[in-house]
Amino acid sequence: MKSAVETGSGLQTMTYREALRLALREELSRDERVFVMGEEVGLFEGSYKVTAGLMDEFGEERIRDTPISEEGFVGAGIGAAMVGERPVIEIMTLNFLLVAMDQVVNHAAKVGAMFGGEVRVPIVIRTPNGAGNQLTAQHSQSFDGWFAGTPGLKVLAPANPADARSMLKAAIRDDDPVLFIENLPIYKLKGEVDTDDDNPARIGRARIAREGTDLTLVSHSYATVRCLDAAETLASKHGVSVEVVDLRSLRPLDVETVVESVARTNRAVCVEEGWPSFGVTAEIAARIQKACFDELDAPVERVGMAEVPLPYSKRLELEAMPGEGRITAAALATLEGSGVLRP
């Protein structure tokens, strides 16, 4: 099976899924040490078809199907990385990575420091998270903050196809363990990708996804898509100019870009798909409060998942999620509280 998306064909429109597949194909071709391993990544072509066609192209040795044992094959990947290989592990959902949390947190993230830098662990763990597909409480969680709080582990979460390709390439070439977080609804998102540009992204750099002057929305992954929708609504219906900062990387975290934005707009709303208590938005809000204390015209607001096990009901699921409506409401409340808008 040959993909319609090819390297070196200039600027192309492709889905997030296709951008990931292109990055994998490019890195598998570039470096023989790279291999892919996970449940159904080969014959079935991946649960989300990211690895479609790769087994036909690179063979069973480099596109390896595994048993249903996340702890086992993540551990095998760590071992392979320690002896010089560059494994890319696919986990069907971030929820299942909890089964292998000891391998990730106590081994992959710590081996480099415990061996004084003499041993590196260049492993990439790809996995989607998030809600919106009626997969209920155990398959709809976002544990981004849990892993981002672990020293020694890099955590990336791109929000568009171009970043998905360039950041996955960067992750594969990095000498440290990288958790590469994707999102189920975002796989079908389309965007332009420059296939002539083989340069990997710089890990640890946020991007300004939309410029604005009245308020800053800070987010990552699919929450960035929702923030961009909210920013458009705020502009068209309320005349508000909103800046959107896409973090892209949770660890390392680009605090400087966030702080520079909030210092300009004087207001911030932080958005994540996870539960807000002890989460990513709590960390971002704390960083903003410390660095921008004198510039803030209103308290930093946070929007996240309702703090309940997610129900199956579609209506209740949507109400629990940090959608465009809740983000817009939080932004308006922040603006009204600082006198920009009248209630």
Name these PLM-found stretches.
Residues 1-177, 181, 318, 343, ...:
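Thiamine diphosphate
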